[in-house]
Amino acid sequence: MLKMVIIAYNEAIDMEVMEMMEKCDLKNYTKVMGVFGRGETSGTHLGNDIWPGRNNLLYVATPENTAKQLASAVKELRAKLGKEGIKAFILPIEEIT
């Protein structure tokens, strides 16, 4: 079964996230850059003077076992980088057209 892994992360760690993707041998993804958000650990990122910084999103469609490996890699990166902020959300894919 295919899963959609959505990874939300601080744009400051983009290089580390892309290295993580490479180590997981994941070459196909969709990246959305410069999104705004608020996280419990990393705080608010609205791209302005009061709340500087932005987030990026990666959408990765992958088999379930690879999605679990990617989630583990995200947890490891979060433990390493701390407050910079990264989270993974795993959703089922019903259909690809």
Regions found by a protein language model. Give the residues of each.
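Positively charged, small/polar-rich N-terminal and surface patches that mediate targeting and assembly
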Residues: 1-97
